[in-house]
Amino acid sequence: MSEKGRLVLVDGSGYIFRAFHALPPMTRRDGTPVNAVYGFTAMLMKLIDDLQPDHVAVVFDVARKTFRSDIYPEYKANRSEPPEDLVPQFALVRAATKALSLPLLEAPGFEADDLIATYARLGEDAGLATLIVSSDKDLMQLVRGDITMLDPMKQRRIGAIEVEEKFGVTPDKVVDVQALAGDSTDNVPGVPGIGIKTAAELINIYGDLDSLLERAGEIKQPKRRENLIEFAEQARISRQLVLLREDAPKPLDIDAMKTPARDMDVLKAFLVEQNFKRLLIRIGASVDAGTSASAAVVRSMGVTLPATAGQD
């Protein structure tokens, strides 16, 4: 039996923030900040070279407001605006994706996570082994069978065992645990007084969120019982917020996501424009001048740079 083809889905939106905070400030000749673009581009180059996937796509958020905001207006309302130096880099990471000849996915009204869920299902239906490249715990609900994750910051593979270690339940029950525990980062309310550990214990006992809420009167701890009854609808709303949609729009079909050969002329032009000397050396191109970056920090992001590259 032949080995399954591999689909790699890269959480582009998640990675740009991590690259921005992991690398020191960098600017190109016109003063535009590019540290996140550098880390993002270096990671993608290494990732594709290492994995050699049959199919690939880089997935982005379009805007903060999605269908979840209609369900619960306070969803993610506590998040601050992105740093000023990061704003111009959002367009540049998309340009980097295209310069690397990689398919790009985004859909208004949906989060990148929903597109990843949708395409993971499509890959599964097509008989592909899907690898989700992300550090986002919210994507762990998708792990099953031939769908696994890679945390690019820690270079750590995540399967069902790792998900259960983090949440205390199997991947198919992660959504119910998150619905109970809530998430302060995304302003998902959950049920007061219930964290991940308690939520996992309850779901493991009662099987799922609906069964737990139906039998909340059986809970012995008075305050916990009271909260589960009083905030039952809040838990159901939270489940709608954390559950990833597998019916998001599909900008491309799977066949259009076959890993293409790089257009080296396009890539070189992009790297020259950004002053990414080290990456130009990596692809064997001549360089004139560039910007500087910390090789040690870049390596800590899981990106190994040539020892002879000098400064960017």
Residues covered by each model-derived region:
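Conserved nucleotide-binding/hydrolysis micro-motifs of P-loop NTPases
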Residues: 14-15, 63-66, 137-139, 154, ...
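Conserved DEDDh/DEDDy metal-dependent 3′-5′ exonuclease domain
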Residues: 55-57, 109-111, 135, 311-312
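C-terminal structured "cap/appendage" subdomains that terminate the fold
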Residues: 230, 253, 257-260
